[in-house]
């Protein structure tokens, strides 16, 4: 049986580790709430912008405006924009996005398309840079805010927009983690460019609020505020032509879509980290309990051995 001192030292180490993981869980829980609040605050603007675009598009002719961001061409080159985090300790969050990116890359390559990568987050950059002979990396972004801002989205949008308008790529797809709840986050693929003005509002959008119940963190599911927005008046008069307005508003809508993908990813990363740290805390607690039992058994065996030696010595 292991030495008593070794077991005791390991118990202390496990308990200290549990304190760290518990602290990280609480920090992630607080940040998840902030990330979700940011998403909620941005939704009214996103909904209004989508409604304005729908209104403008309904006034356009069937020939469609000469909007560069709406143009579709023969697909030759496709750019995949993968969103991961800069740090680990968040379960399968980063690895799931990397796997989905590899799958999509293989699918498009198999169909004969040239595929480029734009990578967001140190984890994706490190992984694909180590395999640079297999993948073409067009741009990388790191050091984004933990709670994404419009500046983060603008810097990325500017890069991909320049690629698309210069016809260096014919389509841009973003691969990010859609936040569902604290224990379920799914990697999704969404076409970012060319934009489609049809059906731009997401009807299945839901809100998940982080609350406490019976002293435990839980999630309440609610209905998104989009339905609460009053409809746009039908008699709005625009000074510019629908084509001019569309060309001016589509870049803003593109940036808003990018910001939403970053926000969803940030919330998913924090939720995954909170879940991972919660599991680590539970495992540390169970391990400490097992080690304590081993320590007590070893201590009891040592005491029994000493008694037997004393009794044996007195008999002799």
Swiss-Prot record:
It comes from Prochlorococcus marinus (strain MIT 9303). The gene is atpG. Pfam families: ATP-synt. GO terms for molecular function: ATP binding; proton-transporting ATP synthase activity, rotational mechanism. The keyword Metal-binding does not apply. It is found in: Cellular thylakoid membrane. GO terms for cellular component: plasma membrane-derived thylakoid membrane; proton-transporting ATP synthase complex. InterPro entries: ATP_synth_F1_ATPase_gsu, ATP_synth_F1_gsu. Belongs to the ATPase gamma chain family. Its main location: membrane. F-type ATPases have 2 components, CF(1) - the catalytic core - and CF(0) - the membrane proton channel. CF(1) has five subunits: alpha(3), beta(3), gamma(1), delta(1), epsilon(1). CF(0) has three main subunits: a, b and c. Keywords: ATP synthesis, CF(1), Hydrogen ion transport, Ion transport, Membrane, Thylakoid, Transport. The lineage of its organism: Bacteria, Bacillati, Cyanobacteriota, Cyanophyceae, Synechococcales. This is ATP synthase gamma chain. Produces ATP from ADP in the presence of a proton gradient across the membrane. The gamma chain is believed to be important in regulating ATPase activity and the flow of protons through the CF(0) complex. It is a peripheral membrane protein.
């Amino acid at each position: 049986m292991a030495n008593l001192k070794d077991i005791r030292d390991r118990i202390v180490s496990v308990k200290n580790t549990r304190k760290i993981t518990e602290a990280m869980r609480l920090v992630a829980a607080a940040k998840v709430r902030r990330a979700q609040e940011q998403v909620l605050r941005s939704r009214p603007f996103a909904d209004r912008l989508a409604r304005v675009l729908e209104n403008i598009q309904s006034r356009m002719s069937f020939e469609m405006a000469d909007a560069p961001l709406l143009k579709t061409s023969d697909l030759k080159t496709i750019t995949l924009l993968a969103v991961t985090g800069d740090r680990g300790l968040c379960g399968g969050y980063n690895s799931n996005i990397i796997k989905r990116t590899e799958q999509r890359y293989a699918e498009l390559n198999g169909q004969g398309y040239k595929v480029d990568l734009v990578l967001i987050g140190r984890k994706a950059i490190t992984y694909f840079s180590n395999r640079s002979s297999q993948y073409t990396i067009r741009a990388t972004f790191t050091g984004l805010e933990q709670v994404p801002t419009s500046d983060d989205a603008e810097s990325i949008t500017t890069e991909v927009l320049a690629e698309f308008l210069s016809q260096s790529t014919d389509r841009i797809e973003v691969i990010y983690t859609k936040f569902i709840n604290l224990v379920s986050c799914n990697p999704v693929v969404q076409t970012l460019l060319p934009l489609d003005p049809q059906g731009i509002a997401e009807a299945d959008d839901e809100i998940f609020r982080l609350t406490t119940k019976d002293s435990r963190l839980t999630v309440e599911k609610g209905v998104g505020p989009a339905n609460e927005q009053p409809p746009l008046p039908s008699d709005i008069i625009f000074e510019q032509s629908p084509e001019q307005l569309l060309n001016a508003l589509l870049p803003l809508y593109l940036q808003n879509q990018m910001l939403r993908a970053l926000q969803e990813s940030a919330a998913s990363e924090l939720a995954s980290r909170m879940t991972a740290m919660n599991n680590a805390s539970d495992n540390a607690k169970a391990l400490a309990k097992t080690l304590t039992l081993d320590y007590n058994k070893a201590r009891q065996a040592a005491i029994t051995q000493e008694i037997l030696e004393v009794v044996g010595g007195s008999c002799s």
